[in-house]
Design a protein with these regions (language model features):
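Signature of N-terminal electron-transfer/Fe-S-associated modules in redox systems
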Residues: 1-96
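Short glycine-rich loop/turn motifs
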Residues: 36-39, 137, 183-185, 230-235
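Extracytoplasmic beta-rich repeat domains
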Residues: 176-179, 225-233
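Fold-independent oxyanion-binding glycine-rich loops
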Residues: 44, 51, 66-68, 84, ...
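Alpha-helical support elements that line or immediately flank enzyme active sites
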Residues: 88, 140-168, 195-216, 234-299, ...
Length: 305
């Protein structure tokens, strides 16, 4: 068991994990963002990346997130940060607030607007902050061995786990989408997705992904995928009338709508794309993956990678 003190309250959890995962997925504290420079918290008063520290390292430590900054102090910080107009869409604003809190680089100023205050306090919702009831979670399995051909995608071991939901492959795509590689295809890069693992148990996702076996006709040298500074993410909400609402942080909602409709082979007016504040210019694939899973499973789906 792990005991973690966050914003003056002690929490208990059974499994070791990164602090960012614990805050966002277990405590639903979404003010701290899963991206470099947006993931700052104070640990015993020292600014620390929540993505770089695990719960096992936090015994007897005091953690302060952006949600734990008192309202009066947060209002002053928001006013200070608004002065240089440096907030842009607001995604990195909570990390800036933690930095200001640590260094006391703030002062009483004229009140900030509600929009600015929501940005700085982390209350402004981005695509990765959206959670809906009874949603499933999705994780892509990326191909390896560029230049080799995939000869088998085997998820029989995963079927033995009661928490396994599904494994979506290229052959399952109803329409046209070039964002996946399947059996018989030659891998061009390690950014290509071979399968989408689905489960309702986010805590089991890593274990389930390890049960998916990809076989190739050769082993080649490739550069491993690094951890992105900012993840791609999207949530697709499935409705009983066979319509989808997709939450994106991409810059072009209409293009995303067109891509999703083409992949699902359905009319565009069955899809509504809700643009949360822009946070990732690489967005575009995640929305289609989420839409595919939501459409095929008839459940709302959330993906992040």
């Amino acid at each position: 068991m792990y005991f973690v003190t966050v914003n003056g309250k002690e929490w208990i959890t059974a499994h070791d994990k990164t602090l960012i995962t614990f805050l966002r997925d277990e405590l639903n504290m979404t003010g701290t963002k899963d991206a470099a420079a947006a993931d700052w918290v104070l640990i015993d008063g020292v600014r620390t990346s929540a993505r770089s520290v695990r719960l096992s390292e936090l015994k007897n430590k005091e953690i302060l997130t952006v949600e734990g900054i008192p309202d009066g102090e947060m209002a002053a910080i928001a006013a200070h940060l608004a002065a240089p107009a440096a907030l842009s869409g607001g995604f990195f604003a909570p990390g800036m607030a933690i930095t200001a809190k640590e260094k006391n680089h703030w002062h009483e100023a004229r009140p900030a607007s509600r929009e600015i205050l929501d940005m700085v306090s982390g209350k402004k919702k981005f695509a990765d902050d959206i959670n809906v009831p009874r949603q499933v979670y999705v994780r892509p399995i990326f191909a390896k061995n560029p230049g080799a051909r995939i000869i088998k995608i085997d998820f029989s071991r995963a079927l033995e786990n009661v928490r396994f939901g599904d494994c979506i492959q290229k052959a399952d795509i109803p329409g046209e989408f070039d964002g996946m590689v399947g059996v018989g295809d030659t891998v061009e890069s390690t950014n290509q997705v071979a399968a989408l693992v689905v489960t309702t148990y986010l805590a089991e996702m890593d274990a389930l992904c390890r049960l998916i076996d990809l076989e190739y006709d050769a082993v080649t040298e490739s550069v491993p995928r690094g951890t992105p500074e900012m993840p791609e993410c999207a949530t697709a909400v499935y409705s009983d009338d066979d319509t989808l609402t997709i939450y994106t942080n991409g810059k072009d909602p209409q293009k995303i709508r067109e891509s999703c409709a083409k992949a699902l082979d359905i009319p565009e007016d069955w899809i509504t794309v809700v643009a949360t504040p822009v946070a990732n210019t690489k967005s575009g694939r995640a929305e289609v993956y989420a839409a595919l899973v939501a459409w095929l499973t008839q459940q709302s789906a959330k993906i992040k990678f």
